[in-house]
Regions:
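Metabolite-binding pocket within alpha/beta catalytic cores that recognizes anionic/polar moieties
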Residues: 1-145, 149, 205
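Glycine-rich beta-alpha junction loops
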Residues: 36, 109, 168-173, 198, ...
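Glycine/charged-rich beta-loop-alpha catalytic/anionic-binding loops adjacent to active sites
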Residues: 67-76, 180-186, 228
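Hydrophobic/aromatic beta-strand patches that form the interior of the parallel beta-sheet core
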Residues: 77, 103, 121, 163-165, ...
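Short acidic/His/Gly/Ser-rich catalytic and metal-binding motifs that mark active-site loops
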Residues: 129-132, 175-177, 219-224
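Active-site rim beta-loop-alpha module in soluble metabolic enzymes
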Residues: 141-187
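A C-terminal functional module that forms or caps the active site or interfaces directly
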Residues: 179-211, 215-219
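His/Asp/Glu-rich mid-to-C-terminal helical/loop segments that flank catalytic regions of hydrolases
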Residues: 220-234
Length: 234
């Protein structure tokens, strides 16, 4: 069996999430997800909130917070980086909190600085250069980010600068080679990150909704890498 032929929807998993958590809960439907400790700290400082539970990991618990904004109950948590970890945590966060709509944003590398400079980036499709998505959907080069147009509508409504394009999701941050970058650019990719294709695959599988966008950080457009805004927070 080829390594990419890992999608098995003919038999059931041996590990069920109910083995790890006593009860399934519902607190709110919409959950905001950030990858930034700085954003988490700002959230805790500026919004009245309470922890409604956590996802357990060997690195320590990931707290899930409930808060209200404009009389609507919302959830928030800080996700680990990478498609494999972030997708597993999302599934467990759903079980702990009841969330099915996930607003996920974070930084990305820029493959086309002319198109992306000073703009938010809305992925239309994600190149599946990671492992987890192949366990949740049939093999393909790209997965469609199905709520792309909804993000576009919101950004247009509030006159936010943005660009729409394909994104490259990778597990191998230190193997973003010149040839790979050029190939992804030829296919229409404007950004590179580490989560979106995996998150979209798991959302498709479980019937969740993903709303994702990025802000530019480092630049991989050309022969040399530029740190640019890497490490900057939004």
């Amino acid at each position: 069996m080829s390594i990419i032929d890992s999608f098995d929807n003919k038999s059931k998993p041996l590990i069920d999430i109910s083995f790890l958590y006593d009860e399934k809960h519902f607190y709110a439907d919409v959950c905001i997800v950030s990858f930034s400790r700085h954003v988490l700290d700002m959230f805790l400082e500026n919004f009245e909130n309470k922890s409604i539970g956590h996802v357990g990991t060997s690195n320590g618990p990931i707290e899930i917070y409930l808060f209200e904004f404009e009389r609507k109950k919302l959830l928030f948590y800080m996700s680990p980086i990478g498609a494999s970890a972030s997708s597993a945590i999302m599934y467990e966060a759903h079980y702990v909190s009841g969330a099915t709509k996930f607003i996920v944003y974070g930084s990305c590398g820029v493959l086309d600085k002319d198109k992306c400079s000073g703009k938010l980036i809305v992925p239309s499709h994600s190149y599946r250069d990671e492992g987890v998505s192949y366990h949740y959907m049939a093999p393909s080069d790209y997965v469609k980010i199905k709520n792309c147009n909804k993000i576009v509508d919101i950004f247009q409504k509030y006159n936010l600068p943005f660009v729409v394009g394909k994104s490259w999701t990778t597990d191998a941050v230190y193997m973003e080679t010149q040839n790979k970058v050029q190939k992804r650019k030829e296919e229409g990719c404007v950004s590179v990150e580490m989560e979106s294709s995996g998150l979209q695959a798991i959302c498709n599988y479980y019937g969740f909704e993903l709303y994702t966008f990025f802000f530019p950080a480092d630049i991989l457009d050309g022969d040399l890498w530029s740190k640019a805004n890497l490490g900057g927070e939004i």
